[in-house]
């Protein structure tokens, strides 16, 4: 482990939830930004336009 000494400063029971929580928050923010600033992403989630028969 390259940065193994960090666990002598921060307890893993505190550090790991903070790390995973911050990654989750960043992922949600990126998805929200893409969803609100593009036109193709919401259409992709809706499955595109249905053609009339």
From Swiss-Prot:
Subcellular locations according to the entry: Cell inner membrane
InterPro entries: Antenna_a/b, Antenna_alpha, Antenna_alpha_CS, Light-harvesting_complex
PROSITE patterns: ANTENNA_COMP_ALPHA (PS00968)
Single GO MF annotation: bacteriochlorophyll binding
Residues annotated as transmembrane: 15-35
Keywords: Antenna complex, Bacteriochlorophyll, Cell inner membrane, Cell membrane, Chlorophyll, Chromophore, Light-harvesting polypeptide, Magnesium, Membrane, Metal-binding, Transmembrane, Transmembrane helix
One GO cellular component term noted in the UniProt record for this chain: plasma membrane light-harvesting complex
Keyword Metal-binding: yes
A Pfam family that the UniProt record links to this protein: LHC
Binding site for a bacteriochlorophyll: 31
Membrane topology term: Single-pass type II membrane protein
UniProt-listed GO biological process terms: photosynthesis, light reaction
Topological domains annotated Periplasmic: 36-53
Family to which the UniProt record says this protein belongs: Belongs to the antenna complex alpha subunit family.
Subunit structure: The core complex is formed by different alpha and beta chains, binding bacteriochlorophyll molecules, and arranged most probably in tetrameric structures disposed around the reaction center. The non-pigmented gamma chains may constitute additional components.
Role this protein plays: Antenna complexes are light-harvesting systems, which transfer the excitation energy to the reaction centers.
Entry protein name: Light-harvesting protein B-800/850 alpha chain
Organism: Rhodoblastus acidophilus
């Amino acid at each position: 482990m390259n940065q193994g000494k960090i666990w002598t400063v921060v307890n893993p029971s505190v550090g790991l939830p903070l790390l995973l929580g911050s990654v989750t928050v960043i992922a949600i923010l990126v998805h929200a930004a893409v969803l609100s600033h593009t036109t193709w992403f919401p259409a992709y989630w809706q499955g595109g336009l249905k053609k009339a028969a």
